[in-house]
Amino acid sequence: MGSDVDWTWKFTPRAADQFDSLDTHIQDRICSKLDEIVESEWRAPGEFLDPLTGGPFSKLRVGQYRLACILDRSESVLEVHRIEHRSGAYTADDD
Protein backbone atom coordinates (compact mmCIF):
# COMPACT_ATOMS: atom_id res chain seq x y z
CA MET A 1 0.00 0.00 0.00
CA GLY A 2 1.19 3.54 -0.69
CA SER A 3 2.42 6.10 1.74
CA ASP A 4 0.12 8.06 4.08
CA VAL A 5 2.47 11.04 3.78
CA ASP A 6 2.13 13.68 1.06
CA TRP A 7 5.28 13.53 -1.04
CA THR A 8 6.66 16.04 -3.50
CA TRP A 9 9.62 16.10 -5.87
CA LYS A 10 12.25 18.67 -6.81
CA PHE A 11 15.30 19.09 -9.02
CA THR A 12 18.71 20.09 -7.76
CA PRO A 13 20.25 22.97 -9.76
CA ARG A 14 22.30 20.49 -11.79
CA ALA A 15 19.27 18.35 -12.61
CA ALA A 16 17.26 21.48 -13.48
CA ASP A 17 19.92 22.49 -16.00
CA GLN A 18 19.92 18.99 -17.49
CA PHE A 19 16.11 19.01 -17.61
CA ASP A 20 16.04 22.38 -19.38
CA SER A 21 18.26 21.02 -22.16
CA LEU A 22 15.82 18.19 -23.02
CA ASP A 23 13.08 18.21 -25.64
CA THR A 24 9.65 19.20 -24.38
CA HIS A 25 8.13 15.73 -24.88
CA ILE A 26 10.90 14.19 -22.76
CA GLN A 27 10.39 16.84 -20.09
CA ASP A 28 6.67 16.04 -20.04
CA ARG A 29 7.36 12.34 -19.70
CA ILE A 30 9.77 12.89 -16.80
CA CYS A 31 7.34 15.19 -14.97
CA SER A 32 4.49 12.73 -15.48
CA LYS A 33 6.57 9.90 -14.02
CA LEU A 34 7.66 11.99 -11.03
CA ASP A 35 4.05 13.03 -10.40
CA GLU A 36 2.95 9.39 -10.64
CA ILE A 37 5.51 8.41 -8.00
CA VAL A 38 4.61 11.08 -5.44
CA GLU A 39 0.86 10.74 -6.00
CA SER A 40 0.60 6.94 -6.01
CA GLU A 41 -2.01 5.54 -3.65
CA TRP A 42 -0.76 1.98 -4.05
CA ARG A 43 3.03 2.18 -3.88
CA ALA A 44 5.45 4.09 -1.69
CA PRO A 45 7.93 6.30 -3.62
CA GLY A 46 10.86 4.03 -2.77
CA GLU A 47 9.18 1.12 -4.54
CA PHE A 48 9.66 2.87 -7.90
CA LEU A 49 13.43 3.23 -7.45
CA ASP A 50 16.36 0.84 -7.84
CA PRO A 51 19.37 1.41 -5.55
CA LEU A 52 22.72 2.16 -7.15
CA THR A 53 25.85 0.64 -5.65
CA GLY A 54 28.63 2.77 -4.24
CA GLY A 55 26.64 5.84 -3.30
CA PRO A 56 23.49 7.34 -1.88
CA PHE A 57 21.56 7.46 -5.15
CA SER A 58 18.73 5.37 -6.49
CA LYS A 59 17.86 5.05 -10.17
CA LEU A 60 14.60 5.88 -11.85
CA ARG A 61 14.12 4.80 -15.45
CA VAL A 62 12.05 7.04 -17.70
CA GLY A 63 12.26 5.81 -21.27
CA GLN A 64 15.83 6.22 -22.51
CA TYR A 65 16.73 8.47 -19.56
CA ARG A 66 17.99 7.67 -16.08
CA LEU A 67 17.38 9.89 -13.09
CA ALA A 68 19.68 9.71 -10.07
CA CYS A 69 17.48 10.37 -7.06
CA ILE A 70 17.58 10.50 -3.29
CA LEU A 71 14.50 10.01 -1.12
CA ASP A 72 14.52 12.51 1.72
CA ARG A 73 12.14 10.70 4.03
CA SER A 74 12.38 13.35 6.76
CA GLU A 75 11.04 16.00 4.34
CA SER A 76 8.96 13.63 2.14
CA VAL A 77 10.79 14.84 -0.95
CA LEU A 78 12.09 12.90 -3.94
CA GLU A 79 15.21 14.84 -4.93
CA VAL A 80 16.37 14.45 -8.53
CA HIS A 81 20.13 15.03 -8.72
CA ARG A 82 20.90 14.01 -12.32
CA ILE A 83 19.08 13.37 -15.56
CA GLU A 84 21.11 11.61 -18.22
CA HIS A 85 20.57 9.53 -21.32
CA ARG A 86 21.09 5.88 -20.45
CA SER A 87 24.13 5.65 -22.74
CA GLY A 88 26.08 7.98 -20.43
CA ALA A 89 24.27 7.62 -17.13
CA TYR A 90 26.61 5.06 -15.62
CA THR A 91 29.96 6.57 -16.51
CA ALA A 92 32.20 8.29 -14.00
CA ASP A 93 32.54 12.05 -14.09
CA ASP A 94 34.60 14.62 -12.24
CA ASP A 95 32.21 15.49 -9.40
Language model segments and positions:
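Acidic/histidine-enriched, beta-strand-rich ligand/metal-binding domains
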Residues: 6, 18, 50-53
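Surface-exposed, Lys/Arg-rich phosphate-binding patches that contact polyanionic backbones
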Residues: 14-25
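Enriched for short, Lys/Arg-rich terminal
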Residues: 1-8, 25-28, 62-65, 70-95
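Residues that form or immediately flank small-molecule/cofactor binding pockets and catalytic motifs
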Residues: 14, 57, 85
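A short, surface-exposed loop/turn module that caps and links secondary-structure elements
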Residues: 35-60
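Active-site micro-motifs of SAM-dependent methyltransferase domains
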Residues: 17, 36, 85-88
